[in-house]
Amino acid sequence: MKIPNMLFVLSLVGYSWGAGAWTPQPWVPEKGVIAVEMAEGGAWSFRHTGIKNWAVNITERLKVMPGDRYELVCETSPLDETRGRFSMNLCLFDAKGKALDWAFANEMMKPGRKVATSFIVPAGVARLYARFRGDGPAAARVDVFSLKRVGSVFPEGYVAPQEPELAAAAQRDFETRDAFDGDSGMTETLCGKGGFFLRDVAANGKYRPISEAADFLLYVKESPVDGGRAFDVTVRERSGRDRAVSLVYAIPLPEGPIAWHETLRRSETFTVGERQYSVSQGNAGRGRHARWPFAAATCGGRAFALGIDPEAPAFHRFGANANTRQLYVVFDLGFAKEHPEAHVRFYDFTFDAAQALRGALVAYRRLNPEMFRVRCSRHGLWTVMDSLKNLPGLEDFGFRFRGRMSEITFDDEHDLLTFRYTEPSTWWVSVPREQKGKAFTLEDGCAYCETLAARGPTEMKSARAQATPQRYAQGWKTSVIRDADGAMVGQTCKRSWCEGVLWLLNSAPGIGGPGAMNDFRVKIAPELFDARYSEPFPKGLDGEYYDSAEMYVTPWCDFAREHFAGMETPLTFDRDTHRPVVWKGMIAYEYIRAASRLAHAKGRLTLANCTPIKWWFLVPFLDVPGSEIWWVKEKGEGGVSWEPMNDEDFMYRRSMCGGKPLCFLMDAPFDHFTKEMTEKYFQRSLAYGALPSFFTWHGVSTFASNIYFRRPDCYERDRPLFKKYVPLCRTLSEAGWQPVNGLLASDNPQVITEQFGDIYATVFNLSDKPQTVRLKVLPPSVATLDELVAESTQTVSAGVLTLTLPPETVRVFRFK
């Protein structure tokens, strides 16, 4: 690996070209596959030839202040025929060096793209650096790069107040990309007002009452619901022009401190500024999307909440603002002549304020029972193994769900549910055998796919089969995503399962119009559902399986105008150009909603990988949500470090799944994944009623050889742990997680407790140190409790149970 003396200059305003003392730093988990080189005129280039994740840090860590406004300019050009896509983003850190966001201000790049954007340093950020990152081959010449501070939203400079309450509030009291107030906020005359407001984002306008928006018609149907009101809203743009707007519905809040309920274990009271809980969505909308389907706040002794109807979502975020005295939802909407309307539904409701966000979740579940409906009563582990016939002692592992169709009769005999595999938004095109190992460009891939499309026919070989290459190619012509320049979005790839081209597709069922051969029809084949599910459930095929449900490799936005009319859900807009686009979240939503409705109509089930992570709106249509997970990180020349999922992420997933099975597949280098790690994995999963299984470690050389259930050295070593923990996990999962714990309460924040069904409660030490906890037993007259992990009986004294738990250890109590 050659890293030349390519240097930057750091000035008071940031980074720009020149002589200095810092070099772009590559990172990649493969050796000898990335190089950074000097070019003429002070430019530089990079080339990555491997297949795994990579990054080139463009700057060192810069010291910044909240509220600082920066401009970022980058111009790239092609280096050679390697045209792989990559992204440019900022990595944010707090004052202690803890990473806060690895993909802030994310920009999708390709050689030849010029980016000029600005951002404001968010709350709590002390340092940041810029980087390129990607997956697979990529190369580009970087002709211009500049990161400069151009001002601050605080004219006199940022000074944090000394009072703890004000200091915390001031950290967020400025406009960011996702803010509601600040430079583009509510005018003073609208503060404290409720109702609908509209902002013309492209014109950098203020929020105005919807009645002042002459180009828009708003239709609202209001109806009573349990504890509140439902709003069925349609917005129509009348001019036929491309538009980018933010539609707001706000609830006025009374005077006094506002308690913002951010997570199930965290609430914050504030008196100035704004609070939001959202996740990055790249260049879609204003860049941030609400993680939860609802938001909750209490103020003046009253509880206020807003929530989205899962049958009619759009790109949205929630927040509470103490300055404007409003709880609000914002929808970032795009309009075009091909798609001039947007339809959303949401609720304005109340909840039990004493239970904070858990109380709001109870109320939201009551409003949306179908979202949390449990269709699968018997739970178990998930596997994607091609064959289980030769796995000895199969019953010890507790399998229930299979993401492969290779042994349907065997599955029926062993009470396993079999799901048919599809992956929305991708088409992995393997090159012809004679081309393998040779140079293959995206242009070559396009020509090859055109040949396949012309060849035909497009009929499926059978109702259960995957599509033929010819059928895929026909769908590709209709559904391929296009970037801001109108180019088809794809990349060359060399993976263990595909050497060739990966195309990214808009998989919504309406693309191309009625009867079109689009990606949805290619993969789901609705016309074959009667034949596919001809046997009575659970005999034969049991449902549909959606891999990569949150579409990790798909670009945030589809700019193809020919796709706009085919979307049922609202468009959004590109953050930087304000052009109307299709957000990939709604592509996944429309694909999974339509396919799941077909499956449920046949009495079948649905399984998905990689959700819920950032998107809540897929789970309502799933019966078995799951995710591959990575809880270990490779270290240097060998070994791994243990980095499990944190409580906040775990509770988000558990909350969105409700009583549905929450399944995991651990991906790890199993040469270094110890028996102790397996037990930690099982104990943490048990604490949340999740179902822990294993898969592999991805990569061309390790994928097949590292599959856990093909390694007797792993599964035989861990067999006693499966026999001990999986039955307990299944018992809790089938009992069903409860939002409010009416059995136990902990006095130690490092020791959490959750309830399952009517009689089970888990107690878990989150920390890496022993913890003592006093558990208040909430039901009266309980003298003893059965503990199921250590198989003991615990005595309750005066309504209290005292425990000392080792690090990362769980206990399960059964109430008689």
Cite the ranges covered by each PLM segment.
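Active-site-proximal substrate-binding groove within the catalytic cores of carbohydrate-active enzymes
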Residues: 338-349, 354, 413, 584-776, ...
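C-terminal beta-strand-rich structural cap/linker in extracellular carbohydrate-active enzymes
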Residues: 797-816
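The substrate-binding groove and active-site-proximal loops of carbohydrate-active enzymes
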Residues: 379-388, 395-403, 499-535, 573-588, ...
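Extracellular and organelle-lumenal recognition/adhesion modules and their flexible linkers in secreted
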Residues: 17-205, 226
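Active-site-adjacent "subsite" loops/lids of carbohydrate-active enzymes
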Residues: 420-538
